[in-house]
A protein has these predicted regions:
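N-terminal pre-domain/capping segments
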Residues: 1-92
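C-terminal helical cap(s) of enzyme catalytic domains, especially alpha/beta-barrels
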Residues: 269-292
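Conserved, mostly hydrophobic/aromatic
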Residues: 41, 102, 183, 213, ...
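Acidic-and-aromatic substrate-binding clefts and catalytic sites of carbohydrate-active enzymes
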Residues: 28-29, 44-54, 75-85, 155-163, ...
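Gly/Pro-rich active-site loop or hairpin
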Residues: 50, 81, 119-125, 129, ...
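Active-site acidic/histidine proton-transfer and metal-coordination neighborhood
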Residues: 85-180
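Conserved active-site loop/cleft motifs that coordinate metal ions or position small ligands
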Residues: 257-263
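Acidic (Asp/Glu)-rich catalytic clusters
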Residues: 30-36, 52-69, 85-100, 140-142, ...
């Protein structure tokens, strides 16, 4: 399956194995005028499907930076089928932007023709696995490009789930040839909430399928009886234990494109660049370690 999409995978600009930044509306003008030293930017596909100033800004920014598209609306886990019109709109954005990478979420968000503004978890079953694989195949065929699936952050589990999430994701990649977007913060959040072993999760993912890593902040909410839950809210700096897990991910997967995400209480662009610099330093350390390991 990989070979089918190889010719279009990096149509405009290769996404480098460096730290990039999630591009948000409040930073458009600054990026155009100041041209910060960012390696690449990622945008949410759905934010650039209509008119207004956003697509025009992106057209200008893509002339100077590689762009990755990250979608939230394909609902690849929905049992009622893929929204063909939405898929076509994704394709239209791709034709205009020529992204280096295209990604979506392992989740669902459509039921009864109604779009639910959230990324909802799937039961990890053979039936759900078949549905997701079918949807991913449909998407890749329509888009004529390999897409990557992001592991979710979750706060509950289904009693009838029979497949560990990491095995589910790896199997989708195996069957469809899609990539895996390894969200390290999501792994840490879900592992903390469910009592999973985060390192074992990383080790279960096929390294050759990992095309990108995401890093973001999360919050901790107090529940009753002294319990806590971690919420993937993308509203703060990356937490120290997530940085530690990122170091382990680099050892497992090697240097890969790594994104700093920040979606709530979005700060000045300089703050995101500071976080990207920390990620870049970790990537460079791993790159140097690889050189030492491979030296004669």
């Amino acid at each position: 399956m990989d070979a089918v999409y190889a010719s279009s995978q990096f149509a405009h600009g290769l996404i480098p194995a460096c730290a990039g930044v999630g591009l948000r509306f409040r930073h458009h003008q600054e990026v155009v005028e100041e041209q910060p030293a960012a390696a690449w930017f990622e945008v949410h596909t759905e934010n650039y499907m209509s008119g207004g100033s956003a697509p025009a800004y992106l057209d200008a920014i893509r002339r100077d930076y590689p762009i990755s598209l990250h979608g939230v609306g394909l609902s690849l886990g929905s049992a009622e089928g893929i929204d063909v019109r939405h898929l076509e709109r994704v394709r239209d954005v791709m034709k205009r932007v020529e992204p280096g990478l295209v990604s979506e979420h392992l989740s669902w968000s459509i039921s009864g023709g109604i779009y639910l503004a959230d990324l909802l978890p799937l039961p990890m079953t053979e039936e759900a696995l078949g549905i997701v694989c079918t949807r991913v195949d449909q998407a890749q065929t329509c888009l004529q490009q390999r897409i990557s699936l992001e592991n979710p952050s979750t706060y509950l589990r289904f009693r009838h789930s029979t497949i560990p999430e990491w095995e589910f994701l790896a199997e989708v990649a195996q069957r469809t040839g899609c990539g895996i977007l390894c969200d390290v913060n999501n792994i840490y959040v879900s592992a903390s909430n469910h009592g999973w072993n985060a390192l074992a999760y990383l080790d279960a993912l096929p390294a050759k399928s990992v095309t990108e890593v995401h890093l973001a902040g999360h919050s901790i909410r107090q529940l009753d009886q002294g319990r806590t839950i971690r919420i993937d809210d993308h509203g703060s700096r990356v937490a120290p234990p997530v940085w530690d897990l990122f170091e382990q991910a680099l050892k497992r997967f090697g240097p890969v494109p790594t994104l700093i995400e920040w979606d709530t209480d979005v700060p000045a662009l300089g703050v995101l660049m500071e976080e990207a610099a920390i990620a870049e330093a970790a990537i460079e350390r791993q790159r140097n370690d690889n050189l030492c390991t491979n030296a004669p």
